[in-house]
Amino acid sequence: MQGRLSAWLVKHGLVHRSLGFDYQGIETLQIKPEDWHSIAVILYVYGYNYLRSQCAYDVSPGGLLASVYHLTRIECGIYQPEEVCIKIFVPRNNPRIPSIFWVWKSADFQERESYDMLGISYDNHPRLKRILMPESWIGWPLRKDYITPNFYEIQDAH
């Protein structure tokens, strides 16, 4: 079933794949990484002016990684905002997605956390570096194929 935004994107020739609706009735779309930045700008201009959240997850061990964006269009009505969920899948051997920091500034720490935990690189992000783990940390802790080190170095807080 195609939602309102999906129909609008089709009408304007923008490539995407409808993934249906979630349990709350929020339309979910899949966008290719190479199309994401231009579609993000279009969505912002269309009225999706609030990035509610961005997260990432490992789809399956050795499989794809996903970056998920929850966008809200508040101008439609403050009591019934229109929401959409965007999913972008990337291969784990070269997980690169254009950063949308320059569209929604609130993506800053969220994209950095996804980089830190899963190793997804957000191209053109101004400060893409680890945010939770030390810079010297090896690997991506939330990947399903991550091997946990069998020791942890206790560091002095001083």
Curated annotation (Swiss-Prot):
UniProt cross-references to SUPFAM superfamilies, sorted A to Z: Nqo5-like
Q: What class of enzyme is it?
A: translocase
Which terms does the UniProt entry file under GO BP? photosynthesis, light reaction
Subcellular location(s) of the protein: Plastid, Chloroplast thylakoid membrane
Q: What is its EC number?
A: 7.1.1.-
Cysteine pairs forming cystine bridges in this chain are: none
Q: Which reaction does it catalyse?
A: a plastoquinone + NADH + (n+1) H(+)(in) = a plastoquinol + NAD(+) + n H(+)(out); a plastoquinone + NADPH + (n+1) H(+)(in) = a plastoquinol + NADP(+) + n H(+)(out)
Q: Main subcellular localization, coarse class? A: plastid
Tell me the InterPro entries matching this sequence.
NADH_DH_suC, NADH_quin_OxRdtase_su_C/D-like, NADH_UbQ_OxRdtase_30kDa_su, NADH_UbQ_OxRdtase_CS
Kindly indicate where the leader peptide sits in this chain: none
- Supply one GO CC term from the record: chloroplast thylakoid membrane
Going by the UniProt record, its keywords in alphabetical order are:
Chloroplast, Membrane, NAD, NADP, Plastid, Plastoquinone, Quinone, Thylakoid, Translocase, Transport
Q: What does this protein do?
A: NDH shuttles electrons from NAD(P)H:plastoquinone, via FMN and iron-sulfur (Fe-S) centers, to quinones in the photosynthetic chain and possibly in a chloroplast respiratory chain. The immediate electron acceptor for the enzyme in this species is believed to be plastoquinone. Couples the redox reaction to proton translocation, and thus conserves the redox energy in a proton gradient.
* Assembly mode: NDH is composed of at least 16 different subunits, 5 of which are encoded in the nucleus.
* Record-given protein name: NAD(P)H-quinone oxidoreductase subunit J, chloroplastic
In its UniProt entry, the species of origin is given as Lotus japonicus
